[in-house]
Design a protein with these regions (language model features):
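A conserved catalytic-core segment of Leloir-type glycosyltransferases
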Residues: 50-120
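Nucleotide-activated donor-dependent transferases that construct or modify glycoconjugates
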Residues: 1-23, 42
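Carbohydrate-associated surface elements
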Residues: 186, 204, 213
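Membrane-proximal helix-turn-helix segments that form the acceptor-binding/catalytic region
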Residues: 26, 109-119, 123-125, 161-183
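An aromatic- and histidine-rich active-site surface loop
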Residues: 96, 107-111, 126-144
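Active-site proximal beta-strand in glycosyltransferases
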Residues: 7, 127-131, 141-157
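A short, active-site helix/loop in glycosyltransferases that binds the activated sugar's phosphate group
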Residues: 138, 177-200
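Short amphipathic alpha-helix
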Residues: 22-30
Length: 213
């Protein structure tokens, strides 16, 4: 069991999601013996304009208006972080240079906000866990400089949201991660060629085999 470490978790699933969330369950389990900062992905500008009454947009508006950093303490060892800004809606961009350039800007801004919160919490030598967030965490390893970077794959990437960019980006994200974890043998087999340090952990979060010493 890993204890006494600092974890930063980036996920597409908002902490305030009404339904059950595998990402939240993982964060809660890890926080039993470690400190966890769970990052809610920012609202993009398109959703900000088109879905102004949604809870995520309303929360973003409140943060911007009150000039708050969005850091909330959930338990003694667990915090969530909202972003007081909007991200560029890059998913509609053609795949290639333009997408990469703007996506990197999104990543840089998000990670700058994360680092500010991590510094406030006095996180050190943190472990980064990217929960299926291929786009907005693609450059997180470079910008956050974690002690260990883990990509957790729990989706087949077959939905329309992933079709344009994920086939190119996911192999790259797998390759540069220190390890890849999946929740099924099939998902592990699909990406094992990109990273030999790939493990099927089912629905659990036992990270003992990933200990870095």
């Amino acid at each position: 069991m890993i204890t006494g470490r600092d974890f930063i978790i980036t996920s597409l699933q908002s902490w305030d999601i009404a339904i059950g969330s595998n990402a939240k369950d993982i964060a809660k389990e890890i926080s039993r013996h470690n400190r966890v900062l769970y990052v809610n992905t920012p609202v993009d500008m398109l959703n900000y304009l088109m879905h102004s009454q949604s809870p995520d947009v309303q929360r973003t508006k409140t943060l911007i208006k009150n000039k708050k950093n969005g850091l909330r303490q959930i338990t003694a060892n667990l915090w969530t972080l909202d972003c007081p800004f909007c991200a560029f809606p890059v998913n509609s961009f053609p795949d290639g240079f333009l997408f990469d350039a703007v996506n990197r800007l999104n990543n840089k801004r998000i990670c700058k906000h994360i680092l500010s919160a991590a510094q406030e919490l006095q996180f050190t030598n943190h472990i980064l866990l990217i929960d299926n967030d291929i786009y907005r965490s693609f450059y997180a390893k470079e910008f956050l400089k974690p002690r260990i970077s883990i990509y957790y794959r729990r989706d087949n990437m077959t939905s329309a949201f992933w079709k344009k960019h994920a086939p190119r980006l996911e192999p790259l994200l797998c390759s540069k991660s220190d390890l890849v974890a999946t929740n099924s043998p099939q998902l592990a087999e699909a990406v094992k060629s990109y990273n030999s340090n790939c493990h099927d952990i089912g629905q659990g979060v036992d990270l003992e085999s990933f200990r870095d010493g």
